[in-house]
Curated annotation (Swiss-Prot):
Stated name of the protein: L-lactate dehydrogenase
GO cellular component, one term: cytoplasm
EC number(s) stated in the UniProt entry for this protein: 1.1.1.27
Organism: Mycoplasma capricolum subsp. capricolum (strain California kid / ATCC 27343 / NCTC 10154)
The gene coding this protein: ldh
Keyword check for Ubl conjugation: no
C-alpha cells in the first residue's frame, strides 16, 4: 500500500468510530476518510465537524465526507465499529445476536462493493463478530483483523505501571483470548524494560495477589467506565488508530489483535486476541509464546467460551 493518499472508510459513525477518526486525523495516518452510517445525518454532521480541523491540525488530511458502501471499492482500509453499545451490567457476549445480524448485513454490502483491502473490526463481541464478517465475506482471513485484546493489554500495562510507579510505555504486558470476561493475562511474557514481571514478585515489589487484582481490574475496567459514562470509546479509538497505522505504514508491528487461529496455541476455527505481526497484508503471522500450563488452560477455556457463542450465530453464515 502507498504511504500517502491512503483512503480509510469508517462504518459506524458513533462514539467509537468518531473517536478513532479524531485520533487518526491528529496522527495524520491517511489523506481521505469516508463515514458510512445507518443514520446518514450524524455521518454528515461528523464529517462537517471534523472538516473544521483541516486548518488547525498540523498532521492534516485532504478530504472527509459522508458516503456509501460504494466508497469501499477503492479503500485501503475499512474500519467497522457499527453495532449497538454495551449496556451497564451486560457482558459483551450477551450482545451477540443483534450485532451479528448487523455485521452480516455490513459484510454483504462491503463484499458487494468490490473491496479488496484490509478490514479492522471493533464491534462487540469483537472476536465473534470478526468471525461472522470473515465467514460472510469469504475474505482472506489475514486481511480481516479484530481489535482483539489491544485495549485489554493497554489497560493491563497502565495498571502495572500505576502499581510500580513507572510509565505504562515501559511495561510490556499482554492479555490474550476473548476481549471480555474470560481474557487471560500472560504474566509469563510480561516485563518492564526487559526485566520479567515475576522478578518483581521475587524481590517483594509485587505479590501474586497484586497480579490477580490487576487482572481483575483489567477485566472490570469496561464495566466501571460504562457505569460511569455509559460507553467506552477513547481507548478503543486509540487502539484502532494504532492497528490501522501499522497496516498503512507496513510497520510489521506486533500487536495483540484478533487473528484467526488454525492450530496456533492449540486452538482453531476462531478469531481471538493473540500477538500477531501487522503490516500491509493484514495480520501476517501469529507469534506463538510458550505459555505456562495454567495460562494455556485459561486460554483454552476462553476459546471454548467463544466457540459456544459462535455456534449460536452459525445460521448467519
Amino acid at each position: 500500500m502507498k504511504k500517502t493518499a491512503n483512503k480509510v472508510v469508517l462504518i459506524g459513525a458513533g462514539a467509537v468510530g468518531t473517536s478513532f477518526l479524531y485520533a487518526a486525523i491528529n496522527q495524520g495516518i491517511a489523506e481521505h476518510y469516508v463515514l458510512i452510517d445507518a443514520f446518514p445525518q450524524p455521518a454528515e454532521g461528523n464529517a462537517l465537524d471534523l472538516s473544521d480541523t483541516l486548518a488547525v491540525i498540523p498532521h492534516s488530511f485532504t478530504s472527509i465526507k459522508a458516503g456509501s458502501y460504494e466508497d469501499c471499492k477503492d479503500a485501503d482500509v475499512v474500519v467497522i465499529t457499527a453495532g449497538r453499545p454495551q449496556k451497564p451490567g451486560e457482558t459483551r457476549l450477551e450482545m451477540v445476536a443483534g450485532n451479528a445480524e448487523i455485521m452480516k448485513n455490513i459484510a454483504t454490502e462491503v463484499k458487494k462493493s468490490g473491496f479488496d483491502g484490509i478490514t479492522v473490526i471493533a464491534s462487540n463481541p469483537v472476536d465473534v463478530i470478526t468471525h461472522v464478517y470473515q465467514k460472510v465475506t469469504g475474505f482472506d482471513p489475514h486481511k480481516v483483523i479484530g481489535s482483539g485484546t489491544t485495549l485489554d493489554s493497554a489497560r493491563l500495562r497502565r495498571l502495572v505501571g500505576q502499581k510500580l510507579n513507572v510509565k505504562p510505555e515501559s511495561v510490556q504486558a499482554y492479555v490474550a483470548g476473548e476481549h471480555g470476561d474470560s481474557s487471560v493475562a500472560i504474566w509469563s511474557q510480561a516485563n518492564i524494560m526487559g526485566r520479567p514481571i515475576l522478578d518483581y514478585v521475587k524481590c517483594g515489589c509485587l505479590t501474586l495477589e497484586d497480579l490477580d487484582q490487576i487482572q481483575k481490574d483489567t477485566v472490570d475496567m469496561a464495566y466501571k467506565i460504562i457505569n460511569l459514562k455509559r460507553a467506552t470509546f477513547y481507548g478503543i479509538g486509540a487502539c484502532l488508530t494504532k492497528i490501522v497505522n501499522a497496516v498503512l505504514r507496513d510497520e510489521k508491528a506486533t500487536l495483540m489483535v484478533g487473528a484467526q487461529l488454525n492450530g496456533e496455541y492449540k486452538n482453531k476455527d476462531l478469531y481471538t486476541g493473540v500477538p500477531a505481526i501487522i503490516g500491509s497484508n493484514g495480520w501476517e503471522k501469529i507469534i506463538e509464546w510458550d505459555l505456562t500450563k495454567e495460562e494455556q488452560e485459561k486460554f483454552d477455556k476462553s476459546c471454548e467460551t467463544l466457540h459456544k457463542t459462535i455456534d449460536s450465530v452459525k445460521h448467519l453464515f
